[in-house]
Amino acid sequence: MAVITMKQLLNTLFVTSEDIYLSLEGENVLANRDKTVVARYPLHTLQAIISFSYAGASPALMGKCAEAGIGLAFCSPHGRFLARTCGESSGNVLLRREQYRIADDPARSCEIARTMIFGKLSNGAASIQRTLRDHAPRVADCGLEKAAANLRAMLPQVLAAADLDSLRGIEGAAATAYFDVLDHMLLSRKEAFFFHGRSRRPPLDRVNAMLSFAYSLLAHDCASALESVGLDSYVGFLHRDRPGRQSLALDLMEELRPCMADRFVLTLVNNRMLRPEDFQMQDSGAVLLSDDGRRKFLKTWQERKQDTLTHPYLGEKLSWGMIPYAQALLLARCLRADLDGYPPFLWK
């Protein structure tokens, strides 16, 4: 059972317990557990419902939501998007049309992409600062302070980037500065867990294998979040269209990489939660998680998503697993012009 059963956020009801069945009573949505009503919410206060429960919802509620223009989305308990219900006309049509218009306008795309990359650099610096704070004696002379300062110094450049190509150049320089010191943030069993640069296809060491797997899981969660709020995960602003690539999911995950994926991998290594034996060395030089290692990784990833924090913009206590959904909601509100701009997730 999830830590939080129900959470109303930005006029969206999140059902995060997997044994909750949703039904309709008059103009109210009822949350039922074992045929007992545990909560009720007036439908007129909601714009959307996102359920992470396999128990489902009544046809009457689905019909009422479709009639009232309330988005009803279903995800697995682990966050995989399954389906949405909508009526004959839906605000999602207007939302997606605006998304496509912005994606076709480089200047407007850059405006949103700037804030996402601002979040990525800010969170990268925060991750480095956390290592400095938690392990000060061991990492005092490793260049971490300088790297964090360099990332922070690039933040004004990000906001001033004139176009997407300039923004990508700044992001690339920041990624180099960040990954140059990542090895100094790995503090356990250095003979097995080291990082000498990013290698993707295939990953060539254990840390790159974990980073690639974490990024894949995070991209999946971001895509599910975007689809659940009615956005097209394949049409991005920073990452341009490419067949089969969920470009908007890649956009959204940029600001979340340092705090949700990279910090997770650092925790696995520094807390000795995975062993060197949990990886397989291929004849091609690729390094992959073994079946047992993948199971451990996934179990710990899902546990991490249940940890809670206070969202820095919303001021609400949320689980880490809800952060992509909160950001997807904020992005949708930005595209609808309910917000002056997109507020990135800024970790502290």
Predicted regions located by residue number:
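A surface-exposed, charged beta-strand/loop segment in the N-terminal or early-internal portion
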Residues: T45, S53-A126
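Terminal-proximal segments
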Residues: A2-P77, G87
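Active-site helix-to-loop segments that bind/position phosphate- or nucleotide-bearing substrates
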Residues: A2-E25, D34, R40, N92-K348
